[in-house]
Amino acid sequence: MEAFTYTLLMTLGVVTLFFAVAFRDPPKFDK
């Protein structure tokens, strides 16, 4: 159960960080 909770927290952290960066500075895919 610890592994599942750890994975869930890591995923949530990565998603939160991704959205924070995306909303702060929209990525330019067309370089």
From Swiss-Prot:
GO cellular component annotations of the record: photosystem II reaction center; plasma membrane-derived thylakoid membrane
Alphabetic keyword roster: Membrane, Photosynthesis, Photosystem II, Thylakoid, Transmembrane, Transmembrane helix
Membrane topology: Single-pass membrane protein
An individual GO BP term: photosynthesis
Domain of life (superkingdom): Bacteria
Subcellular location, record wording: Cellular thylakoid membrane
Main localization category: membrane
Pfam families: PsbT
InterPro entries: PSII_PsbT (IPR001743), PSII_PsbT_sf (IPR037268)
Transmembrane segments: 3-23
Cited function: Found at the monomer-monomer interface of the photosystem II (PS II) dimer, plays a role in assembly and dimerization of PSII. PSII is a light-driven water plastoquinone oxidoreductase, using light energy to abstract electrons from H(2)O, generating a proton gradient subsequently used for ATP formation.
SUBUNIT field: PSII is composed of 1 copy each of membrane proteins PsbA, PsbB, PsbC, PsbD, PsbE, PsbF, PsbH, PsbI, PsbJ, PsbK, PsbL, PsbM, PsbT, PsbX, PsbY, Psb30/Ycf12, peripheral proteins PsbO, CyanoQ (PsbQ), PsbU, PsbV and a large number of cofactors. It forms dimeric complexes.
Family: Belongs to the PsbT family.
Protein name per the record: Photosystem II reaction center protein T
Gene: psbT
